[in-house]
């Protein structure tokens, strides 16, 4: 392999390292290991037919060429996406900082205090601006947040409503079309009927359970919904409002006029449009609905010594716990973008946010009056940033379009011939003059350029916001760049990311996010593209999307791809809806059961339920494989109604099951489809693939297998790949005149992430991708060989090897010493490591996945750490350490405890803080001691203002 290729930088072990590792494993070669790990009948017969790999320099030139094909016109289309200004201090120190973008979801509280605080800021800003008491720390986008709101309100129906079968949700006709489309996709399988119309004309019938409104609406008009909301509540209907969060700096927030749920996007709080995403959706609601709200919630708690700290609260609501009983399948969301939006509000504060909103509104007022003088009638009586014009008889929309395009301007064109525009943070006086000139030329009239636009408003007193927001001190302390930079740095020092050490989370694939892959995201031609611009303006994006789709087809062995799903869970849902649409097309729509192994991740059953199926659980045998007898029995028992099998491969237990082809054949013989969960695709690429194995559809996690970052809990991308017969049923989009199964707001989902995966594939090439897979399997088996004689490995494949991850046995340790897998996980923090996956998929164990990116020296240091912890466990077992006071049950040890004048433990400070030599050279200090989870759930405090009595 050429040394100037990315593979040499991405893969952590070299040939000499591999030989050492193979000897430890007990095989003669890497090929022998792979042959003994992956069943021969599913091995690909030829290398992947991918383009030759590019060097990093060649890719930089190639991606710049693609970016150059994108035409960055000034866009006023609006409809949920707006140009914005990302403060350089946030772009440089957060968006482009691997400490922030390579970290994992903050389940491990003690090594996540920085991003937990940043997400708490986000929640607080959302609560303040919406005037709601509770918010989560992001959803995927506005449209999916709307669908979650409808599902949540459906679950909140009163007993009488449930008994009466109330199943109608009213959607005001002036909602964004992409939002209505996604709600429709989610509502149909739940048995929810959608009724659209004018909110003023609605009759509250007994079958109605909820209403969804847009504020300001899709035309830009800010309606006064107070009377309507009162009527809805009188009729026992809940009200959800899609609100432009920046407009709430000036408009009366929905929380003040009775909304039950407020949702939307925070894209315009400093996040670029990225041709549709990623950006953080938001969701706020009443306190009494906290256990029904989808998504993750950050709350306050205390550590064991009483120090205030943050944690993820009410986790038992989530799909990985509740499985088929979950009311949402949301998992990965948009944590990195929520973090950026939170920092945006911190940096600007109340005054800055109000000034930005006021400037936008003032320019809009100026344009309404100035364009109105040219003979155009503006229809919105109350508005924030959006105008809709009826054209005079002498002017056509096509004339306007032609003139606008000649000035490199995009406007919004309505089906009835009206023309609209939405002003944003980047609009200045010069831009306003250009807009004015477009309408003047079309009308054949002169206009006077202006040098300044005074502050003005048309918002009535009834709709004008009177209450303060962002009043917590965090929103007033960091308005200089120096203070902001130091605040961000102060937070990132509290977190473990890949910049610190290996993150061995099983089933999460925390691999390198190479700088060469990440750089294109800071390119304006990729950052600043609106998703609804004419296709020729996005030629670079479209070419990249086409190329990437073709490459993913090759890698998966499938015929079609949709890049629309914004996460793995969204991919699962999209894949199941695709299966449903296909079955209905062949007269098999009655099939409503999905077979799922007991070992599956909780998103599988949660997604199946959301897609309108019922689940049937299939047992696993003592070796961790699908119990074939139980599978056959369940398939036969349900064959007339069986729609699909959902299966992860290699299994969630980290094993390549030898019967996988037969499993697919059994399901197909019943007339059902095989859905392969691609969470473990990192063990397949180049060696086998879902299509070759016999699956019909799979989703991929770009943030796992294909090198896009986790971002502390998103953004993720979950494209689905399907066999030929399913291609016609892939998610569509209104932009293409086909809204079937639409699952996200933007036509290509989080398109801004795609250059990362495209770069990964283009720079790795077929040989590099295949070697990455082999090395991931090598690294996992090396760790298994090093740890098998102490902890023990729970499951192995037919020939005694694991796949790309393995499950470490900890149950016997607990039986003998009382030391739990959680104690081991917390002790790892003292050594500078993030915990592996706890108690999944087997309770009382740790699941470890090292990925191909780690070096032998890092793997050996991790082994030394685990063996040293093993010795610490033996000290407890042998009575050398106190069972009630030892380094494990007291872990982690924060700096403030170690340097305290009081030290009353039975072991030394050195043993607590510097257990091995490598820690002395690279010590990570936790900021808090072990956190009290019960306290944080017993009293949920989800904003910066919260405190304990």
Curated annotation (Swiss-Prot):
The glycine cleavage system is composed of four proteins: P, T, L and H. InterPro entries: GcvP (IPR003437), GDC-P_C (IPR049316), GDC-P_N (IPR049315), GDC_P (IPR020581), PyrdxlP-dep_Trfase (IPR015424), PyrdxlP-dep_Trfase_major (IPR015421), PyrdxlP-dep_Trfase_small (IPR015422). The glycine cleavage system catalyzes the degradation of glycine. The P protein binds the alpha-amino group of glycine through its pyridoxal phosphate cofactor; CO(2) is released and the remaining methylamine moiety is then transferred to the lipoamide cofactor of the H protein. The modification N6-(pyridoxal phosphate)lysine is found at residue 704. CDD domains: GDC-P. Keywords: Oxidoreductase, Pyridoxal phosphate. This is Glycine dehydrogenase (decarboxylating). It holds the Pfam family GDC-P. It comes from the Bacteria. Its cofactor is pyridoxal 5'-phosphate. One of its GO terms (molecular function) is glycine dehydrogenase (decarboxylating) activity. Signal peptide: none annotated. SUPFAM superfamilies: PLP-dependent transferases. Gene3D superfamilies: Aspartate Aminotransferase, domain 1, Type I PLP-dependent aspartate aminotransferase-like (Major domain). GO terms for biological process: glycine decarboxylation via glycine cleavage system. It catalyses: N(6)-[(R)-lipoyl]-L-lysyl-[glycine-cleavage complex H protein] + glycine + H(+) = N(6)-[(R)-S(8)-aminomethyldihydrolipoyl]-L-lysyl-[glycine-cleavage complex H protein] + CO2. The keyword Mitochondrion does not apply.
């Amino acid at each position: 392999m050429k040394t100037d290729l990315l593979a040499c930088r991405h893969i952590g072990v070299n040939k000499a390292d591999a030989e050492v590792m193979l000897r430890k494993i007990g095989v003669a070669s890497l090929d022998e290991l792979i042959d003994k790990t992956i069943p021969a009948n599913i091995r690909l017969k030829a290398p992947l037919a991918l383009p030759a790999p590019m060097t990093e320099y060649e890719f930089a030139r190639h991606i710049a060429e693609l970016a150059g094909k994108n035409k960055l016109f000034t866009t006023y289309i609006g409809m949920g996406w707006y140009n914005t200004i990302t403060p350089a201090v946030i772009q440089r120190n957060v968006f482009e900082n691997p400490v922030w973008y390579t970290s994992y979801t903050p389940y491990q509280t003690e090594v996540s205090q920085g991003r937990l605080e940043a997400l708490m800021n986000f929640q607080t800003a959302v609560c303040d601006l919406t005037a709601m008491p509770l918010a989560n720390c992001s959803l995927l986008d506005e449209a999916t947040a709307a669908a979650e709101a409808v599902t949540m309100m459906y679950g909140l129906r009163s007993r009488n409503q449930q008994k009466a079968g109330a199943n109608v949700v009213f959607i005001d006709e002036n909602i964004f079309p992409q939002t209505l489309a996604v709600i429709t996709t989610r509502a149909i399988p739940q048995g929810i009927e959608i009724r659209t119309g004018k909110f003023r004309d609605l009759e509250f019938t007994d079958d109605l359970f909820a209403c969804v409104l847009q504020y300001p609406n899709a035309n830009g008009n800010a309606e006064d919904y107070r009377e309507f909301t009162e009527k809805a509540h009188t009729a026992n209907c809940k009200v959800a409002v899609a609100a432009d969060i920046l407009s709430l700096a000036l408009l009366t927030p929905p929380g003040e006029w009775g909304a039950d749920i407020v949702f939307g996007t925070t894209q315009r709080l400093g996040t670029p449009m990225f041709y549709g995403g990623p950006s953080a959706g938001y969701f706020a609601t009443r306190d009494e609905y906290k256990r029904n709200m989808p998504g993750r919630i950050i709350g306050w708690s205390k550590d064991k010594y009483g120090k205030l700290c943050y944690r993820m609260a009410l986790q038992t609501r989530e799909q990985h716990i509740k499985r088929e009983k979950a009311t949402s399948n949301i998992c990965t969301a948009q944590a990195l973008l929520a973090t950026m939006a939170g920092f945006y509000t911190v940096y600007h504060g109340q005054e800055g946010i109000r000034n930005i909103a006021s400037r936008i509104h003032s320019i809009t007022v100026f344009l309404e009056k100035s364009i109105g003088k040219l003979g155009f009638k503006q229809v919105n009586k109350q508005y924030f940033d959006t105008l809709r014009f009826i054209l005079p008889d002498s002017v056509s929309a096509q004339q306007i379009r032609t003139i606008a395009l000649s000035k490199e301007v995009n406007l919004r064109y309505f089906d009835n011939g009206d023309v609209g525009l939405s002003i944003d943070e980047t609009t200045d006086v010069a831009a306003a003059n250009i807009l004015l000139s477009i309408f003047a030329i079309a009308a054949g009239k002169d206009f006077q350029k202006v040098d300044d636009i005074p502050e003005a408003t048309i918002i009535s007193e009834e709709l004008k916001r009177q209450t303060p927001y962002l009043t917590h001190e965090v929103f007033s302390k960091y308005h200089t760049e120096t203070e902001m930079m130091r605040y961000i740095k102060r937070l990132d020092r509290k977190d473990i990311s890949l910049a610190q050490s290996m993150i061995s989370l099983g089933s999460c694939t925390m691999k390198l996010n190479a700088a060469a892959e990440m750089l294109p995201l800071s390119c304006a031609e990729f950052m600043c593209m609106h998703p609804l611009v004419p296709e020729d303006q996005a030629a670079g994006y479209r070419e990249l999307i086409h190329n990437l789709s073709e490459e993913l087809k090759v890698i998966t062995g499938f015929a079609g791809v949709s890049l629309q799903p914004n996460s793995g869970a969204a991919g699962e849902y999209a894949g199941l809806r695709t299966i449903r649409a296909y079955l209905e097309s062949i007269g098999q729509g009655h099939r409503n059961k999905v077979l799922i192994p007991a070992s599956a991740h909780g998103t599988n059953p949660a997604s199946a339920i959301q897609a309108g199926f019922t689940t049937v659980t299939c047992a696993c045998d003592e070796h961790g494989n699908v119990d074939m007898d139980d599978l056959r029995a369940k398939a036969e028992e349900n064959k007339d109604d069986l729609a699909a099998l959902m299966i992860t491969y290699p299994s969630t237990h980290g094993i390549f099951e030898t019967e996988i082809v037969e499993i697919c054949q059994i399901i197909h013989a019943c007339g059902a489809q095989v859905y392969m969960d691609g969470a473990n695709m990192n063990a397949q690429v180049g060696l086998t693939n879902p299509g070759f194995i016999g699956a019909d559809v799979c989703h991929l996690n770009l943030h796992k297998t294909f090198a896009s970052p986790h971002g502390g809990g998103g953004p993720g991308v979950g494209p689905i790949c399907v066999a030929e017969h399913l291609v016609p049923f892939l998610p569509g989009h209104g932009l293409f005149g086909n809204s079937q199964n639409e699952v996200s707001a933007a036509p290509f989902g989080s398109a801004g992430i795609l250059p990362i995966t495209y770069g990964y594939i283009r720079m790795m090439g077929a040989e590099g991708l295949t070697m990455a897979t082999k090395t991931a399997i090598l690294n996992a088996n090396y760790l298994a060989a090093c740890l098998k004689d102490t902890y023990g490995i729970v499951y192995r494949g037919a020939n005694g090897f694991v796949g790309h991850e393995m499950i470490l046995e900890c149950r016997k340790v607990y039986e003998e010493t009382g030391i739990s897998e959680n104690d081991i996980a917390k002790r790892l923090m003292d050594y500078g490591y993030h915990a592996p996956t706890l108690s999944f998929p087997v309770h009382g164990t740790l699941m470890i996945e090292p990925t191909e990116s780690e070096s032998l020296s890092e793997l050996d240091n991790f082994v030394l750490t685990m063996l040293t912890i093993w010795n610490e466990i033996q000290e407890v077992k042998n009575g050398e350490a106190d069972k009630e006071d030892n380094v494990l049950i007291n872990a982690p040890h924060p700096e403030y405890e170690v340097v305290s004048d009081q030290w009353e433990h039975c072991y030394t400070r050195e043993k607590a803080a510097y257990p091995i030599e490598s820690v002395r050279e690279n010590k990570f200090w936790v900021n808090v001691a072990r956190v009290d989870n019960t306290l944080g759930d017993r009293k949920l405090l989800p904003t910066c203002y919260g405190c304990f009595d």
